[in-house]
Amino acid sequence: MQNIKAENSERFMKKNYRCRIIFSSLSLILLFIACWIYVSNRSTDMVIYDWLSIDVNNQLFCFLRNTEIEFPDWVLYNLPDALWLLSFLFMNEAIWGKDNRKYIFVAVVTIFALSIEILQMFTLFPGTGDMLDIISYVIVLIIYLINNFLFYCYEKFSKN
């Protein structure tokens, strides 16, 4: 009996480790894509560059901006925000796994992102408030929650 418990525990740890690697890798890939879209297509006089002390004449920065690809507006202006939120949610998943306390962070970060957009709409925070950003945040949250539900339901029923 003890042997079976140890074997199941070891299998769980390996599976859990793989899930954490997958979620953290996806998070980093999404973060990179969002940053690339943002840096390569947005104006160099944005406040974010001052906040982060980014030299817009840096060679790497100039290299990233040298793209001839034309994207639709929603890709340039809404997709990076959605990818940043999804990146956070996936990294949160990698860190917390099955622990339900992760939903506290999901709620706080999602509410924060939505609040910033709403404050921007009323010019109470610098930036351009955009309803498509709000919609993209809600879509990302729904995708994340459905993914969690399906993933854990599959895992639960595949044991039987």
Where do the PLM segments sit?
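Bulky hydrophobic segments
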Residues: Q2-N160
